Amino acid sequence: MTLNSLPVWPALQAHYEEIRDAHLRDWFAPANDRAPTRAERFTFEGGGLAADFSKNRLTDATLALLVRLAREAGVEARRDAMFAGETVNPTEGRAALHTALRANAADAPFQAQVAAERAKMARFADAVRSGAWTGYTGKRIRHVVNIGIGGSDLGPKMVVHALHHVATPDIATHFVSNVDGADLARVLERIDPEETLAIIVSKTFTTLETMTNARSLRDWFVANGCPEGALAKHFVGVSANPAEVVKFGIAEANVFEMWDWVGGRYSLWSAVGLSIMIAIGPERFDELLAGARDMDEHFRTAPLERNLPALQGLVGIWYRNFFGAQSYLVAPYSEALHYLPSYLQQLEMESNGKSARIDGAFVDYPTSAVTWGEPGTNGQHAFFQMLHQGPTLVPIDFIAVLTPEHPLASHHPKLLANCFAQSEALMLGRTLDEARKIAGPAKPELAPHLTFPGNRPTTTLLVDALTPRTLGALIALYEHKVLVQAAVWNINPFDQWGVELGKILGKVVEADLTAAQVDPAKHDSSTSALIARARKALGE
């Protein structure tokens, strides 16, 4: 199946040509925006969240055609296959059952395994939080260091930061991912080996960055007084390869299992989230799962016309494949959600940044847009200039938390006002005539610089309060959005072959950096020159 061979495609293309030059300002004009208002018609709820799609460049007819596109592309069938545990990751011959990690139905796939591992996590987290689990000198754990990269880092880091307000104040959680030694070194400056627990997270337990950092941390413990025989008090492992964890030197009792039917970027709900559970406690971790389950149920049961993940995905396709948008922005007006854009970068681009269809043919249409973002209001003072007046179309997801999770409540109306005002300004713009009035007769030459084209599309997601449950729903919303887009593009969102070639060549280059001699013909001239400069700097 190719996207532009679907029966609905010509109708969508004709509809795009019909409305491409229409301006949102006109659709919101009082003469056109009668009851039910545009905001009422295009605001939908699900999983405890609300989404206002009204400031997007679409009409009722657009949504009807996009929903038809989803049905013709088999979105519902792909969704149902994923939940049923079918092989939806054909290139690796695997299911993608991250939803099973938060299911509560006894007949859901792998429930006995999931429940047993979560109970083990809870016992361990309670022991660490209560002080029953101590370091080698008998001191309680005050620092948890999570070592992992990609999905073993981005998800847990994002959630721990977001839920800081409900986390225990007795334990500081640190995250180390980069093979650059500066990342680990800066954490080592802030921790005490007698009071530190390391969680090493790697599906294979062979990941270069993770194992390099893990070995350096283990050496640091020993160099700072921890007997090798006592390292079991300070190291636990999370992996789908328990034998390799034990080989590293972690006690078998300290191994937590993840499974190959859960992709790394979808894994925070598993033992990969052990650092989350230690920070917020098992009960609140269960609330996080419950929120994701709320969104799972909404995604499974709501008609596509009112289905938040489906609508999110389809609106993204509208801009990517018709308007030609090359990127989209996530702007959470919440400092607690500081790491959400980074998390979504991996979720969206590693999942859907593909050029091969499931059937092995190459696509002849764009797939994943570049995902980027920054919390508000910081972004307003960095790149919103380009969003308002630049020539590039960048669709935006605003995320607003309506009640603060901190005691400085007087700040919150200012934060929300900026969020809502930005969406209004991006939609309305300012005409040249309006700009001339502002510039006045004294400075008419200023008018073009005061003009805003407007018609910049935004979606605003509303969260009543940032809790473990609403955060779980928000994350699951984006997970399912990715699946919807993958189904329409007919690609596999659950593999990541694009990271392999660089890894393979990286091992070759690393060996050349320290070899006695290097054959200059082994690499292209640019890479050979880079290696030569680095060898000189390294003293080789």
Curated annotation (Swiss-Prot):
GO terms for cellular component: cytosol. Keywords: Cytoplasm, Gluconeogenesis, Glycolysis, Isomerase. GO terms for molecular function: carbohydrate derivative binding; glucose-6-phosphate isomerase activity; monosaccharide binding. This is Glucose-6-phosphate isomerase. The active site is at E350 (proton donor), H381, K503. NCBIfam families: PRK00179.1. It is an enzyme of class 5 (isomerase). Catalyzes the reversible isomerization of glucose-6-phosphate to fructose-6-phosphate. The lineage of its organism: Bacteria, Pseudomonadati, Pseudomonadota, Betaproteobacteria, Burkholderiales. PANTHER family: GLUCOSE-6-PHOSPHATE ISOMERASE.
